[in-house]
């Protein structure tokens, strides 16, 4: 898999993307559930909400809050197919491959790890 450093450098320059942070509630949820469960949640959300060629309510399918993965998706531009096309060069209108889904989960997970390791 390619390095995520260039992507995260670009995301950090976006005023919208860089404002997202995990709150105390989301941090606690991550601690209670553990990394494997959170990673599985991310994989499930990606498979259900992003993987279809034409996801239901595309552009609005990811809530802005309510789960650490949702926050991470907005922070990493993995929230809808439009953002995936713009930020990750993953074309719209085609079902996501397993490899693409793994990449998206890795991006989300990386952001969560960085957030959890900040004071």
Swiss-Prot record:
Superkingdom of the source species: Bacteria
InterPro entries assigned to the protein according to its UniProt record, in alphabetical order: DUF4186 (IPR020378)
Designated name of the protein: Uncharacterized protein YneG
Organism: Escherichia coli (strain K12)
């Amino acid at each position: 898999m390619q390095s995520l450093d260039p992507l995260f450098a670009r995301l950090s320059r976006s005023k919208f993307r860089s404002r997202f942070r995990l709150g105390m509630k989301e941090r606690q949820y991550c601690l209670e559930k553990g990394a494997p469960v959170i990673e599985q949640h991310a994989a499930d959300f990606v498979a259900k909400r992003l993987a279809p060629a034409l996801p239901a309510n595309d552009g609005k399918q990811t809530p802005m809050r309510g789960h650490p993965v949702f926050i991470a998706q907005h922070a990493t531009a993995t929230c809808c197919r439009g953002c995936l096309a713009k930020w990750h060069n993953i074309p719209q209108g085609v079902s996501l491959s397993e490899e693409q889904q793994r990449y998206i989960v890795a991006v989300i997970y990386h952001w969560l790890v960085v957030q959890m390791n900040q004071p």
